[in-house]
Amino acid sequence: MSQMTPREIVHELDKHIVGQAEAKRAVAIALRNRWRRAQVGAPLRDEITPKNILMIGPTGVGKTEIARRLARLANAPFIKVEATKFTEVGYVGRDVESIIRDLTDAAIKMIRQTETAKVQSRAEAAAEERVLDALVPHASTWNAGEEGDSPARQKFRQKLRAGELNDKEIEIDVSAAPIGVEIMAPPGLEEMSSQLQNLFQNFQAGRTRTRKLRVRDALKLLKEEEAGKMINEEEIKLRAVHAVEQNGIVFLDELDKICKRADYGGPDVSREGVQRDLLPLVEGCTVSTKYGTIRTDHILFIASGAFHLAKPSDLIPELQGRFPIRVELNPLSADDFVRILTEPDASLTAQYAALLATEGVNLEFADSAIRRIAQISWEVNERTENIGARRLHTVLERLLEEISFDAADRSGTSITIDAGYVDAHLGSLALDEDLSRYIL
């Protein structure tokens, strides 16, 4: 679990997302409250439930990006899902309980990676010994281990560590790969399919087979195999279940797309039906997974939606009450676009410059060009559909199309994009509303 303070979390988000201070503060406080709850005594801790967040704002203003960055900061089981992927229980499609199963899988993977990192050096040493056994078997008069190496084995060990034997082929015994069986289960029977898959995989458990590999590939394969032997899978499962129940975070995107349409009177299995199924999940229920039962009482749900065709009040009242914290994200202005093009650590202009640098082309953007690109993007958004910061991708691709095409032939040159270049390539398109609607 992350121990960062809300101020530190907002500072990290500021490196990648421009503006939207209110949304950043809300998610930062929610993330910090996970840590605060863990410090509270046991009887009261169980009574403290997370306050779920609903982020409302037009497309392209940073809702999904906040989720992506939060996943890296959380250091807790985290999953991002689209509400539109699910259908009501009993109909063809995925039911909402699969969210918790996927979250548990993410927790297993996260904890396994952490444990594997702890035994990395031991696994590397064990893999090295097995490769050396294939290259120079132990003589009966020499003891196993580095200190008891024969002179020939010591020489091969030095060459192996220097990388001189990377391309040499050796034969090693490795665990047989499990049988790959993909079982498509009907909705509600995913647990049965996973049990059947485990059954097929257990047929080959403990079996080995001889493979001929290059030393480089053998070291990598054996390191993974040795690390797998050193970590306790049962302990990982127990820790993952606990981490999901106490610190799990679910980011539910496109929530507005499952609002019921007023002009539609039939059964809406992928809209209101999904909302009804989400209710117990968000409120707190028990979900069966292949790792055990998961209680969802303390899982934090962060939902987001553009709500341009629907309103938050179009959600069923019970679900509205499950998201007590409402945050509105602001539409982006031309000044925001300027900041997006320059301020983030991996700004769009820096990305394009780095891509063209691989061809030997030095690309620079003048301040006047950045201001003009931002202004054109904002104007096109205002006149056509407002797609937020995603408009910058479209405009920059169009602007740099010619340079990108000819870059391989212009190696060693420097190109500076100024306002005149922008107007020459985009000015007429931006002014023509019909053209900009289809091209920009």
UniProtKB/Swiss-Prot annotation:
Regions crossing the membrane: none
Residues the entry annotates as binding ATP: 18, 60-65, 253, 318, 390
Record key words, sorted: ATP-binding, Chaperone, Cytoplasm, Nucleotide-binding
Classification via InterPro entries: AAA+_ATPase, ATP-dep_Clp_protease_ClpX, ATPase_AAA_core, Clp_ATPase_C, HslU, P-loop_NTPase
BP terms from Gene Ontology: protein unfolding; proteolysis involved in protein catabolic process
Pfam families: AAA, AAA_2
GO terms, molecular function: ATP binding; ATP hydrolysis activity; peptidase activity; proteasome-activating activity
Assembly with partners or alone: A double ring-shaped homohexamer of HslV is capped on each side by a ring-shaped HslU homohexamer. The assembly of the HslU/HslV complex is dependent on binding of ATP.
Homology family: Belongs to the ClpX chaperone family. HslU subfamily.
Protein name: ATP-dependent protease ATPase subunit HslU
Organism, as annotated: Methylococcus capsulatus (strain ATCC 33009 / NCIMB 11132 / Bath)
Gene: hslU
